[in-house]
């Protein structure tokens, strides 16, 4: 899927959790400001997440989340994906470049990286529904 705010390939399946922030902006793109609450929420529920050099969220060297931003009219739209229990085999198949690609992308070139599912790194098993609820409760004040 192509996003008007840039970034590379976005993969969606039933094991994927998406989030979006729309906030007032001061004219600068600040990934730390919007990724910090996501990372703090993940850490609070036992996911050892951190921001990597390319502003993705990772566990160690394995990517679990990508995101993109767009600023317009004093507002910042930031949205991201979280791989909870995605089918990584399908993800690999559709993101692997083939010699005979029949189209040329106008979007941002996707970075090649190794990914993992969050579920594999939890101290105790939980469903995607429980994960979503716990994440939301940590990211959004009551």
Regions found by a protein language model. Give the residues of each.
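Long, well-ordered alpha-helical scaffolding segments within enzyme catalytic domains
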Residues: 28-44
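Long, positively charged amphipathic alpha-helical accessory segments at protein N-termini or as interdomain linkers
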Residues: 38, 45-47, 65, 73-142
């Amino acid at each position: 899927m192509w996003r008007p705010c840039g970034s590379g390939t976005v993969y969606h399946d039933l094991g994927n959790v998406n989030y979006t922030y729309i906030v007032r902006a001061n004219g600068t793109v600040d990934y730390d400001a919007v990724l910090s609450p996501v990372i703090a929420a993940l850490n609070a529920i036992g996911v050892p997440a951190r921001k990597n050099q390319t502003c993705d969220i990772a566990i160690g060297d394995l990517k679990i989340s990508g995101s993109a931003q767009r600023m317009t009219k004093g507002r910042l739209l930031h949205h991201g994906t979280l791989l909870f229990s995605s089918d990584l085999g399908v993800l690999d198949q559709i993101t692997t470049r083939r010699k005979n690609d029949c189209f040329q992308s106008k979007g941002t070139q996707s970075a090649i990286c190794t990914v993992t599912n969050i579920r594999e790194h939890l101290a105790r098993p939980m469903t995607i529904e429980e994960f979503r609820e716990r994440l939301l409760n940590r990211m959004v004040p009551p």
